[in-house]
């Protein structure tokens, strides 16, 4: 989003944008509605399934008859089609998940790049014979378990029986649940069990994270790893070897598929339709977002594919090996509901450790799928007595100020500095569970604390407010205005969207440049180290 949002502001200067960083789950939006809050005009979510999104349906517009919906290949949009034909979610450009192969290593050992599953296994065995790990994956993560499990059996999942089961699962109601079928899913687990054996998983592999598998690959000690095309694309420049993305192989080349997932899905609140001018503006923005240029901005230079007709937004060298698969539209969109992620991790790890064979894995997966699960994070932790709005006013966001006050008190600091996007929702009166507290915080932020003199604190605030000599503007929109606790500041907007720091005060008295203060800082490395700050990181 970091390239898309300023592009939209520049493209549509007549519109006032307010970007809110939310949480990567449909439950986040459900919680907003449960508190009788209004959804933003356009909402997005990366981890998506129609199953998870169903409770939001009555609050979202049907986009099936819009011009932007007509730009999609119907085969991909059908994944988001509700039983009555409504389409409320549109998929953004696709990230490609697969196997990155060190092409130079294959050439060095005269091992052919595989074109089907048997050749894939033969390549693994050939590398193992010369002391090189054939294949490795970061099995620790839920997405790796989910993607390799589904990837190993895409032909079955894309069969008539497989797509019928998926449609039934995606359209289930809160009053009922859909278990695994007895035709497709037993084969999925049989193929996954064989896949795990063929790639030679070892005890302890279920704990492998990204860095421990990436370093041997970069050092030419591993021939293939699970990764994305975006990561594979940077390998020639960063690590000095050529890498190609390989698909999830079938028995023949014609049975091979690329596993994909949208960078996010977008929907529109049905309150937008009540205002003709706003509706026209939102549809205009959506058309821009799903244009070739918009999706390129969304991708931010990463290798992606488009689900839209006649849009080619990648020139990725890592995807050249799978050009025929892309041309054949063999792009499988992963099934990615919250429960599928969770269960795939649990069952996948137990298959890796040998606790489950294919039959036991099928039974355990099915049991978890149909058994209601108590949420351990739903316990009420405290009750909030005062509500604060997230809306930006002339004095900033009251919700963000409230959070910074709480953080300053928690960490016993004299001054705290952060950003409005630290807060993803208004703070409301009522009970808070652990999960709801996490939703208030928009993400995992870098925090630091130390002793600084007033002059250093003044320099920090100048970095975060003032436009630089090269024109870089840290306050690209008002949401990026610093939020402080224990210290007040005044700025002058000398030109629209450009600010100058005028004064800093503590309890009404000027900041003492020679005094020492305990300062707590919360932000993200992306903002702190971005070139708009002239590479001046927060102290």
How would you describe each model-predicted region?
Residues 88-92, 121-177:
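Extracytoplasmic/periplasmic solute-binding protein
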Residues 297-350:
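Long, aromatic- and glycine/proline-rich binding clefts that accommodate carbohydrate-like moieties
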Residues 10, 109, 236-300:
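Extracytoplasmic/periplasmic substrate-recognition and gating elements
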Residues 31-34, 40-41, 69-104, 133-134, ...:
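A structural signal for short loop-to-beta-strand junctions that line the ligand-binding cleft
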Residues 46-97, 112, 121, 147-148, ...:
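Hinge/lid segment of periplasmic solute-binding proteins
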Residues 1-52, 65-68, 113, 360, ...:
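Conserved N-terminal structural module of periplasmic/extracytoplasmic solute-binding proteins
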């Amino acid at each position: 989003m970091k390239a898309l949002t300023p592009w939209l502001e520049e493209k549509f200067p007549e519109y006032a944008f307010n970007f809110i960083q939310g949480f990567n789950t449909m439950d986040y939006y459900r919680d907003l509605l449960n508190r009788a809050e209004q959804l933003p005009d356009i909402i997005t979510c990366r981890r998506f399934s129609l199953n998870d999104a169903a409770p939001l349906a009555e609050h979202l517009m049907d986009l099936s008859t819009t011009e932007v919906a007509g730009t999609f290949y119907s085969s991909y949009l059908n994944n988001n089609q509700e039983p009555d034909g409504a389409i409320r979610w549109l998929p953004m450009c696709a990230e490609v998940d697969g196997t990155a192969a060190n092409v130079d290593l294959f050439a060095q050992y005269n091992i052919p790049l595989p074109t089907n599953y048997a050749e894939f296994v033969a390549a693994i065995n050939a590398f193992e014979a010369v002391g090189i790990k054939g294949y490795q994956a970061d099995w620790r993560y839920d997405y790796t378990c989910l993607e390799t499990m589904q990837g190993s059996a895409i032909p079955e999942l894309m069969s008539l029986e497989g797509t019928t089961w998926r449609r039934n699962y995606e359209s289930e109601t809160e009053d009922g649940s859909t278990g695994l079928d007895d035709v497709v899913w037993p084969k999925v687990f049989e193929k996954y069990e064989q896949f795990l054996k063929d790639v030679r998983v070892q005890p302890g592999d279920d704990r492998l994270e990204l860095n421990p598998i990436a370093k041997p690959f970069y050092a030419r000690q591993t021939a293939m790893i699970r990764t994305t095309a975006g990561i594979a694309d940077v390998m020639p420049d960063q690590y000095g070897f050529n890498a190609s993305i390989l698909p999830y192989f079938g028995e023949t080349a014609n049975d091979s598929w690329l596993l994909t997932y949208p960078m996010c899905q977008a929907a529109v609140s049905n309150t937008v339709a009540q205002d003709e001018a706003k509706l026209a503006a939102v549809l205009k923005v959506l058309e821009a977002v799903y244009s070739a240029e918009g999706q390129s901005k969304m991708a931010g230079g990463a290798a992606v594919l488009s689900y839209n007709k006649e849009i080619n937004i990648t020139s990725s060298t890592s995807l050249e090996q799978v050009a025929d698969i892309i041309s054949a539209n063999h792009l499988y969109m992963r099934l990615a509901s919250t429960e599928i992620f969770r269960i795939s991790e649990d069952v996948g790890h137990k298959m890796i450790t040998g606790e489950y064979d294919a039959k036991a894995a099928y039974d355990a997966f099915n049991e978890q799928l149909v058994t209601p699960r108590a949420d351990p994070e739903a316990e009420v932790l405290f009750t909030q007595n005062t509500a604060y709005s997230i809306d930006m006013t002339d004095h900033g966001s009251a919700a963000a100020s409230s959070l910074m006050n709480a953080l300053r008190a928690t960490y016993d600091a004299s001054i705290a500095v952060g950003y409005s996007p630290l807060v993803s929702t208004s703070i409301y009166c009522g009970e808070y569970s652990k999960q709801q507290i996490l939703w208030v915080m928009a993400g995992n932020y870098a925090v630091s604390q130390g002793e600084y003199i007033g002059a250093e604190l003044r320099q920090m605030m100048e970095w975060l407010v003032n436009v630089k000599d090269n024109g870089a503007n840290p306050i690209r929109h008002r949401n990026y205005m610093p939020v402080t606790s224990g210290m007040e500041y005044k700025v002058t907007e000398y030109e629209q969207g450009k600010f100058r720091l005028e004064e800093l005060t503590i309890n009404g008295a000027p900041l003492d440049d020679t005094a020492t203060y305990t300062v707590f800082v919360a932000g993200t490395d992306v903002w702190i180290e971005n070139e708009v700050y002239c590479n001046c990181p927060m102290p």
